[in-house]
Amino acid sequence: MNDALAPTIAVIGGGQLARMLAEPAAALGIPLRLLAEAEGLSAAQVIPDHTVGDYRDLETLRAVTKGCAVVTFDHEHVPTDHLHALEAELAVRPGPEALVHAQDKAVMRARLAALGVPCPRNAVVTSTAEVTAFGYPCVLKTTRGGYDGKGVWRVDAAEQCADAFAAAESAGVQVLAEELVDFRRELSALVARSPSGQVSAWPVVESVQRGGICAEVVAPAPGLDPGLAVQAQRIAMRVAAELDVTGVLAVELFETTDGRILVNELAMRPHNTGHWTQDGAVTSQFENHLRAVLDLPLGAPDARAPWTVMVNILGGDAETGRLYDGYPHALARDPRLRVHLYGKGLRPGRKVGHVNAYGDDLDDCLERARHAAAWFRGDLGNESE
């Protein structure tokens, strides 16, 4: 064996996050081996060494990871028992003892409370009566499996609780009640951490959600009090260290109307709120995730420009939305625009790509990114049709 060859990283999950690991992996000469849920998925289009199979099957996981130095993830859904089994064969990063805090909201809330990390008031509930005792209005969440607004219900009265309990029973999970937070906006603190303990923290960003889905990210968060920015970064770094996270950790936060920071969610993988780093930071979240899981020195997280705006391209109608055919207008109008498409077909509300616009003027960056995303979505240019 040639010791100069980089070790192979196994990646579980065929979505766009795995896809976006491929470019920095190629630049660093790091081979990737992918387990995708189906042929033709986003990551399978760009990672030749891929297998189609079920991540819930341990033998499939063992076959894909055989000969790899480390395994990492596009999502948090691999069964915890399987992760423990894989640990006997290769490095699992992040490890199952860390990852369970991103998989199970009840486990996450209990651990953060033990650490004294500020969170919304919460409780596991088993009946409508317990929700009523907790108090309305509140938010009900299934403890596992929810994302992009799925598995989350706002409830204002007892008769609205049935859907949450039915979904939890069907999935075999619990229901978590959380107070309805009066927040000014949502923030995200993103860090990368290596097994040796090195940590790299990007600027805290503002995340704009629509319909439970991340629509825009502004880096850095405009007008954020410097003290709150430091607090948010310190929370992310402390959580990464206390939970022994390896790779990228995203800490989604509420900035409350009375000036506090509360932790909303954790994700232990590259995250939508970090896509701006591909073009707006010295080192992207995807490159630092690869460096971290291999315990290589981490890259600088510094911003390349005063402002970077990321806007998701959410698929519009197949008749009016654009993918490749949106390039002539978008690229001619803004030669500095950076476009990232995921190789997905159009479907209303589906994340099919994102754009990054960076520069010295925030309003200009917002206009450029929003215009481009609207053009690809088909909201512009079809008025006469």
What would you call each of these model-derived segments?
Residues 151-258:
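Internal nucleotide-binding/catalytic subdomain
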Residues 54-58, 80, 128, 158, ...:
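Structural motif corresponding to alpha-helix initiation and N-cap regions
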Residues 5, 291-385:
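Peripheral (often C-terminal) accessory segments that flank ATP-dependent C-N-forming ligase machineries
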Residues 230-251, 257, 267-320:
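Active-site "cap" helix and flanking loop/linker of ATP-utilizing ligase/carboxylase catalytic domains
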Residues 89, 95-152, 158:
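A conserved helix-loop-beta module that forms one wall/lid of the active-site cleft
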Residues 1-107, 376:
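ATP-binding N-terminal substructure of ATP-dependent carboxylate-amine bond-forming enzymes
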